[in-house]
Design a protein with these regions (language model features):
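Alpha-helical transmembrane segments of multi-pass membrane proteins predominantly involved
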Residues: 1-360
Length: 360
């Protein structure tokens, strides 16, 4: 956990590049939009510049990820981790971000999204998702999660002339704040039990030799952390915010919500279960099994009663999350690999379906 500038810089280079150019883009857009232009189609020119500049930054960030010479290690005093899971998780994440963004180009033209703020919020939320995949600490994960969530709240209510969209963003904000509070409460209990928030230390502390000596606050804190993840992953019965949010948000934003965030969340969720608390398999396997059964049945039955396509897709995703949790509850490497194989296939299917219905 020592600080080494060269190692930490190499590990963090793609995120540093992406974050730096996101800030540069924000300053450039602000200057360009505030300048007194003589031509009429200034907003349309700004939209084109915003789209292509964001696309190039995403593409070069993916190239940096693929050609990163750093070796697998933890950096920034153990708060972030560069390992095979985070590496392939970020590759998968940016691949689908690029695919979603390219598909959305026509949507931006049709819906006349001419505000550069949309592209800045999109970029910063992608940066938060990228940081989430390599989080090795409960607090670093929370900071990355809030960076992503604050942008998501604004994106969900981006149609300011639609009261339905503003309502969706407000619901998402309120329930997102509640889920973050539940997660932080669990983290505080775990910190009081162990004295740290680092995943690596948790994996050593919560070993089989110490299970009998752990106070009740440790189990309660673990439960609240897991419930916070259930909220974010729209697992039943913590899914109430999702249908209204997806329906009220712009179609491209719902498309983005449905495909990309689950990658980062499931990577961190698997790291917490199989690294920090694997010795508690007897406890969380039954909890995941129960939630997975709830999600499968509520997702399947709830979808039958829907009359709008967005709400139907939301309940479908709830059911699929249940199947992924079912594989997690197995508690073995085969269950974990099966879950991520299912996730990749699910992402391609959802991407294809949303791409078709994006313009309806």
């Amino acid at each position: 956990m020592l600080f080494s500038f060269s190692t930490d810089f190499l590990c963090f280079l793609p995120e540093l590049f992406f974050g730096f150019f996101s800030c540069v883009s924000l300053f450039f857009y602000s200057f360009f939009s505030g300048a007194k232009q003589r031509f009429i189609q200034k907003t349309f020119v700004l939209r084109d510049i915003s789209f292509w500049l964001t696309l190039q930054v995403l593409f070069f960030t993916l190239l940096l990820l693929l050609n990163n010479p750093a070796s697998y290690t933890t950096f920034f005093f153990g708060s972030l981790s560069f390992d095979i899971v985070s590496f392939y998780g970020k590759i998968l994440l940016f691949f689908f971000i690029l695919c979603v963004f390219i598909i959305g180009q026509t949507y931006f033209y049709i819906k006349r999204i001419n505000s550069f703020e949309f592209f800045v919020l999109f970029s910063i939320s992608c940066l938060g998702l990228c940081l989430m995949t390599q989080a090795n600490d409960f607090l670093s994960f929370y900071v990355a999660l809030e960076l992503q969530s604050l942008c998501f709240y604004a994106l969900a209510s981006f149609k300011r002339d639609s009261a339905f969209s503003v309502e969706a963003g407000l619901k998402y904000f309120v329930l997102g704040a509640i889920s973050s509070g539940i997660y932080l409460f669990g983290c505080s209990l775990l910190y009081g039990t162990v004295g740290t928030t680092n995943f690596s230390v948790f994996s050593l502390f919560f070993s089989n030799n110490f299970v009998g000596t752990i106070p009740l606050s440790g189990f309660v804190g673990f439960f609240f952390v897991i419930v916070g993840f259930f909220f974010k992953l729209t697992a039943a019965p913590f899914h109430a915010w999702a249908p209204d949010t997806y329906e009220g948000a712009p179609s491209f934003v719902s498309f983005f919500f449905a495909v990309v965030p689950k990658i980062a969340l499931l990577v961190v969720f698997s790291r917490i279960l199989f690294v920090c608390f694997y010795s508690w398999l007897f406890a969380w396997s039954h909890l995941l099994l129960l939630v997975s059964l709830f999600s499968v049945f509520i997702g399947a039955l709830g979808a039958l009663a829907q009359k709008k396509i967005k709400r139907f897709f939301v309940f479908s995703s709830i059911s699929h999350v249940g199947f992924i949790f079912l594989a997690f509850s197995n508690g073995s490497f085969f269950g974990l690999s099966s879950a991520f194989f299912y996730l990749v296939i699910y992402l391609f299917i959802v991407f294809s379906i949303w791409s078709f219905f994006l313009f309806f």
